């Protein structure tokens, strides 16, 4: 291959690390004050991707990551939770199965067939039934949290023990078998997932190259952390999210991640009070939620460090392609638990007093203002197809290919990871047939030529589309068009030049109608190629608006 491969003939290993709902600037290489030395080390020894894009929510991104194609093709055209609630719209439609479907050859399946040891520990969110467990999609060893989230201490009060509660699938599995959460002693998600992955790697045949998948559930709600880590951030956020946002933006400028003259998107409080409107007690409560969040991120980093150190100890680190990423923008929804769980959290089982926040028996999230401090300068947060929902931090370390401490602003997507890994492993994609079934060709593009020769990853004629919760976006080059249905307001396409307008502030639809019309035509192509099923605007605005901004903001 074109890059300087290591002398040994052994194929490269792969470690894919996914943070859950981590904001753009929540780690120090991207401007955070949170203590993340291990992620910092990855950045110093690798490349920061500042134009890396995902879907706007978790399971669609994960389907794209493991399939190399669009979520509407891979089975997560909408999140499974949304399809169940609105089955009349999306139920039974191809690409809306709610699990990683059989139309795609999953990355671990392909690598396992090529002789790789495949292992995962962490969040799955790509199928709840035994025929859809990770062990059925190519993972030799797996410890998985099946649904989209869970208590970080494995505390499930009254819900699963109560026979009156409808049947719920097992939360955790080890390979083919359910795991009783009550058997997980001294459990904290990030600690346990890293420990299990290390154990899995210890048990492999030492000469066998590996693909390891480490999808953490941190810092997804409920925000929880061991007390000693929360205490480290006591008082750190007492000035509120606006000050944090200002400090993060300046740090990004100092790091060379954004231009000095960038104009950030305004904050949309989504009906919440501004910091100055809060009482002293409300400020203290809000700041504490951010302290817990920061503690979760630090623990995430600590456990990434444990895995990296293990690989170094066994002499495999420099032969391992490591990628760290977030699955979407920071979670800014005020009532995010409700649309996912389809019910209100059982508050009576939790103690959300100030001193107990972050403990195993609390249930909290931090809301839109803290989230948008993390996604700035981009617009909004998770759930939106604006940049705040889909532009995520990503870092790659792989010495045979990537020089240390560099920044790439090349537009890339999560779909590119599969073809990149396959090219590095010298394993061809199976094409249209795999294990006796018809499969699709990946839409993603490999990154090798970009890192070695500086070539663009995507051609001038390439376009990228997004759709989730009825929101639509299409991008070609630096221009991006978005379409977001709103209650009581006629919806029109908007146009933005992201090279000049990272906050998506200046709608150019009337200035460049020719560019907008071209992008709308590309949207129609994307819609046809991927099988997007769009509900009527009024239905989307009224019913599927799980993430509703103020009317003036979109």
From Swiss-Prot:
Bound how, and how many: what does the cofactor note say? Binds 1 Ca(2+) ion per subunit.
| PROSITE patterns to which the protein is assigned, alphabetical | SULFATASE_2
Extract the Pfam families matched here: Sulfatase
InterPro entries noted in UniProt: Alkaline_phosphatase_core_sf, Sulfatase, Sulfatase_CS, Sulfatase_N
Q: From which residue to which does any coiled coil extend?
A: none
Q: Name one GO cellular component term.
A: cytosol
> What name does UniProt use for this protein?
Uncharacterized sulfatase PB10D8.02c
This protein's species is Schizosaccharomyces pombe (strain 972 / ATCC 24843)
